Amino acid sequence: MLKGIKEFFKSFDNMLWGYKKVFKASPEYVIYKVLHAALSALQDLLLSVFLLAFVLSCIEQGKSFGYAAKYILIAAAFMTAKFIFESIGTQKCLNRGIEKITRSLSLQLYDKAIKMDMSFYDDPNFYNDFVWAMNDAPTHILLSFDLLHWIVYVAVSAAVTGVYVATQDAVGVIAVAVSVVFRVVLHVIAVKKEVKMAEEKKPFQRKRDYINRVFYLNDFAKDIRLSNIKDMLFKDFKASSRDMEGVIKKHSKLLVFLSQCYYAVTTVALNGYLVWLLYGYFFTGSVATLGMVVSLHNAISRLSNSLTSLANVLPAIQRTGLYVEKMRRFLDTKNLMPDEGTKELPERFDVKFKNVSFAYPGSEKTVLKDINLDIPQGSKIALVGYNGAGKSTLVKLMMRLYDPTSGEIALGDDNIKEFPVEDYREHISTLFQDFQIMAATLGENISMNDQPLDEERAKEMLDLTGFTPVYNRLPNGLNTRLTKEFDDEGTSFSGGESQKIAISRVLYSDAKLLILDEPSAALDPLSEYTLNHTINELAADRTIIFISHRLSTTRIADKIYMLENGQIIEEGTHDELIEKKGKYAEMFLLQAQKYR
């Protein structure tokens, strides 16, 4: 019991947190939703409880048409005013407010995502919350206002009808109280049963969802056409459906019984009270008019439904609060990697690794062990080794996407932690192995910022990477839209062409340190040779880190580091390492045989 109360207040606190966020983004949206709910409740009560009873009483008592029309016109004026308020509010407050709120919440999420430690991507529980927050949080926070609208509506309805019934007939209050207690108890039992049924269905539903994805995702399109796996999937889908039917059948009898009891309690309470009112009207005179009979009966019905709805608000608040909590937890998460540096970056970008070791968060396996590197500005460094050697992890530390478990990385004489992370990363430009072409123009894909594009420089970089023949065929030059994400006429490129764009992006920047992870993986040997020499000449005064499996790239490096199992096992120039006849020489000669 105590745990349930704590969970409720926690969910309620989360809802208030979400409402504050929304009010800050669009106060007019919140005010409109609350006022609309209150006015809607009053309008419904006016029509179903008071106006109908008033008209019947006027007819029964022989009142003049003018007398009745005066009050009907007042009611009509109220409804007209409410309609005008609703029409203007929908456009001015509701629709605009939704856009403002979505924009505000999304920008907060994007800003947090950019600043979030990379280590959080390695935590599956946090990553699930992160994905949910990015995809669904704004929608669910807006949906929570539908709950607020409902709460205000039933609260106003319950308050008005409660006062009205209490002042007219105390028996009605007793009838409502008994009805509500039974209905709430039945509802709680039914909800628990439905939750249990949903939990039992979940494994089968998950399997059906997976099969559904297999048939519409592009990733599986070729496999299901070139194999007989579809027969097995059909069989599994039918089996999962039958299992779900079994779960539903198992729980359906009790749920039907509870539903019938709920209906019976409602019917007995309301019809019983109607009999009481009619008895008072025809025999005792305790109810003066037929209009009062209709009015009190409708009021009791509304009061009963409103109080039952308010009782059911508790699980709705808990459920909605859980959704909001995910976004709150995501935005409130503190980075494990502090950004407390205040020093200005030195003129030279000389990087040093001093006895650096590293293990990914949550893992006891050491990925890098006692790494020592000296990378003066302007040097050309190659990191080589087989998959899993630790090359990509090493450059992630260099970019300060992670901090070392032990040892330090220095820029000049200071630990890189002494510098603001954003300032430090501004001087690094990276071509990742899994680089992405953005759904934007070619020019925007090269500049990767919102600053005015230096078109001549962008064209020069594209030319240096050998992209010019493709560029000359483009309909709109640097303004050509890439990918078909937003434009059916968008242009898509081959892997090699896309890689040339990505390399142009790196060269276009003014960064002092360029990190190229497999820069020529999608290129033919001739293009690779030309590109490597072009990069080397163009970035003569900038540091370049090459990560490569194809060792033809490494020949232009000033120094080569061979990694294995997270350790540097060999270092030197290409010629020095060939003379040593170690692992590097063995790897190089094996690759050279492919071109003989």
Predicted regions located by residue number:
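Alpha-helical segments in transporter systems
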Residues: 28-50, 71, 75, 141-151, ...
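Extended non-transmembrane interhelical loops and adjacent amphipathic helices
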Residues: 1-16, 95-142, 204-247, 320-333, ...
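Membrane-integrated ABC transporters
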Residues: 1-44, 66, 90-94, 123-159, ...
